[in-house]
Amino acid sequence: MDIIAAIEDRSSAARLTEPAPNKEQLEKILRAAAHAPDHGRLSPWRFAVMEGPSRGILADAMADLLLRNHAHASAEMLVAEKSKALRAPMIIAVAAHVTAGHKVPEIEQVVAVGAAIQNMLLAAESLGFGSMWKTGAPAYDAGVRQALGFAADDQIIGFVYLGRQLAPGKPREHTLTGLVRYL
């Protein structure tokens, strides 16, 4: 596989369907994550894999969050919020488990988790799956974090949605104009 082409061709897939990665494919995706650069070898990533009915845990937690923030949310709003957790056959919540006070600064530990997620996206692509890295209010909510079984001081960095892409994504053109300074 040409890694540059894979990086340039990969795009987020908004519409994903069955099948989800099987056990062997999931293992490859998670192993790719664990191969991310990790100063201090702290393995600061934690994963919560949701497939099939277990996505309902996330759906319920998202609905609870909506109700806490909008006590008068309509039934339609709750259904719409829950449906966000059903947009892919598999969702992996990825959290940073930071070792506070370690010689490796916290920011480096969190960035390592971001690199792990990028590895997951590229591994999924190489296995023929579409993917999307999502965040939003649920990623920053203690109730969602608790519902997914993460430690109180873990921070969800993203939700990786995985499945078969219904329509080809549109890779973006990226320019370096104004972003690079040569010294």
Residue ranges and their predicted role:
Residues 144-155:
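Short, electropositive alpha-helical surface patch
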